[in-house]
């Protein structure tokens, strides 16, 4: 999604943000964006690990059923 944004594009976005929000608000906005990104990453990581746990649980159940049947 953002792979096409280069250095000039990032500089342009930063300058526009500086004009809109002013220099005093930029650190606060940066911290908020960083926290949001961190929460998003941890949420996606927990979703992925939850899926892996479900797959392992299903495999263990299948193995137990095969062992009990055989």
From Swiss-Prot:
Subcellular location: Cell membrane; Cytoplasm, Cytosol
Record has Cytoplasm as a keyword: yes
Residues forming coiled coils: none
Keywords from the UniProt entry: Cell membrane, Cytoplasm, Membrane, Protein transport, Translocation, Transmembrane, Transmembrane helix, Transport
Record membrane topology: Single-pass membrane protein
InterPro entries attached to this UniProt entry: TatA/B/E, TatA/E
Keyword Cytoplasm included in the entry's annotation: yes
Induction: Expressed under conditions of phosphate starvation.
GO terms for biological process, alphabetical: protein transport by the Tat complex
Gene Ontology CC terms, in alphabetical order: cytosol; TAT protein transport complex
Transmembrane segments: 1-21
Pfam families (UniProt xref): TatA_B_E
Principal place of residence: membrane
Complex and partners: Forms a complex with TatCd. Two types of complexes exist: one composed of TatAd and TatCd, and another composed only of TatAd. Soluble TatAd forms homomultimers bigger than 100 kDa. Soluble TatAd associates in homomultimeric micelle-like particles with a size of about 12 or 25 nm in diameter as well as in elongated particles of 12 nm in diameter.
Role noted for this protein: Part of the twin-arginine translocation (Tat) system that transports large folded proteins containing a characteristic twin-arginine motif in their signal peptide across membranes. TatA could form the protein-conducting channel of the Tat system. Required for PhoD secretion. The cytosolic fraction of TatAd binds the precursor of PhoD.
Further remark: B.subtilis possesses two minimal, substrate-specific, Tat translocases: TatAd-TatCd and TatAy-TatCy, each one composed of a TatA and a TatC protein. TatA is bifunctional and performs the function of both the TatA and TatB proteins of Gram-negative organisms. Membrane-localization and maintenance of TatAd is assisted by TatCd.
HAMAP family, sorted: TatA_E
Family: Belongs to the TatA/E family.
Name by which UniProt lists this protein: Sec-independent protein translocase protein TatAd
Protein source organism: Bacillus subtilis (strain 168)
This protein's encoding gene: tatAd
């Amino acid at each position: 999604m953002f792979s096409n944004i280069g250095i000039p594009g990032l500089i342009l976005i930063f300058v526009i943000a500086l004009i809109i929000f002013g220099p005093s608000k930029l650190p606060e906005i940066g911290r908020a964006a960083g926290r949001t990104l961190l929460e998003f990453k941890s949420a996606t990581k927990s979703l992925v690990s939850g899926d892996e746990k479900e797959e392992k649980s299903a495999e263990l159940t299948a193995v137990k059923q095969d062992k009990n049947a055989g």
